[in-house]
């Protein structure tokens, strides 16, 4: 089972990725982890990556595809893999296709922007313990205070509405076009293209998990 998982920040991809990995016995592959591992290993490719990252540059798609091809040859990918955060752009998706990397399913966890803004901007955190609350879905007993210590809760910078809106803008301009790319490829050439699966990302974690599994096991 070779899967690409797509969805906006706050759509619940992380939770569903864990469910998919457990169910199908496949590793989650993120480009960040691959880049760090290559640098640590000190391979020729890793040294190249280190050089680019040291100057604050962007690692080329060609280098990332080379890393992907090496990574999926490893033993833990015998049953497949789950790509998280890759591909991010249509050129990366095309490079993956041209490199002959076979993908079985592209899963999109679909949640509308207003719901994501509500989910993320409503989060409150107790910094010392890491306890997370939500003003609507999981409120503290006393507004703005941690249940255990009574200390004040904070809203992380990443969860502020303005920041969430900016992150969504980036997603819509860069990654959302991938949905159209894979959908249209599946319509034109169903035999060669990955199966495109759109899963409604609103509901309980278990409901969404069941939708994902049902779609993948059709």
Curated annotation (Swiss-Prot):
This is Adenylate kinase. CDD domains: ADK. ATP binds at residues 10-15, 123, 132-133, 203. Belongs to the adenylate kinase family. Catalyzes the reversible transfer of the terminal phosphate group between ATP and AMP. Plays an important role in cellular energy homeostasis and in adenine nucleotide metabolism. Residues 122-159 are annotated as: LID. Residues 30-59 are annotated as: NMP. It comes from the Bacteria. It is an enzyme of class 2 (transferase). GO terms for cellular component: cytoplasm. Keywords: ATP-binding, Cytoplasm, Kinase, Nucleotide biosynthesis, Nucleotide-binding, Transferase. AMP binds at residues 31, 36, 57-59, 85-88, 92, 156, 167. Monomer.
């Amino acid at each position: 089972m070779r899967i690409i998982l797509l969805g906006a920040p706050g759509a619940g991809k992380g939770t569903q990725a864990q469910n998919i990995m457990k169910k199908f016995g496949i590793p989650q592959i993120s480009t960040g982890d691959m880049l760090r591992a290559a640098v640590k290993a000190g391979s020729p490719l890793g040294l190249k990556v280190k050089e680019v990252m040291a100057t604050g540059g962007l690692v080329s798609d060609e280098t990332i595809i080379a890393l992907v091809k090496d990574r999926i040859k490893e033993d833990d990918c015998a049953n497949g893999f789950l790509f998280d955060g890759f591909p991010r752009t249509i050129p990366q998706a095309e490079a993956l296709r041209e490199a002959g990397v076979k993908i079985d399913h592209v899963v999109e966890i679909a949640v509308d922007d207003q719901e994501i803004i509500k989910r993320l901007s409503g989060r409150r955190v107790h910094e010392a313990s890491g306890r997370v609350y939500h003003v609507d879905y999981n409120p503290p007993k006393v507004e703005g205070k941690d249940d255990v210590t009574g200390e004040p809760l904070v809203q992380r910078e990443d969860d502020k509405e303005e920041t969430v809106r900016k992150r969504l803008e980036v997603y819509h301009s860069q990654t959302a076009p991938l949905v159209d790319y894979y959908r249209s490829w599946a319509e034109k050439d169903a035999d060669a293209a990955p199966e495109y699966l759109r899963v409604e990302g609103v509901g309980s974690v278990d409901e969404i998990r069941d939708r994902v599994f049902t779609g993948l096991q059709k």
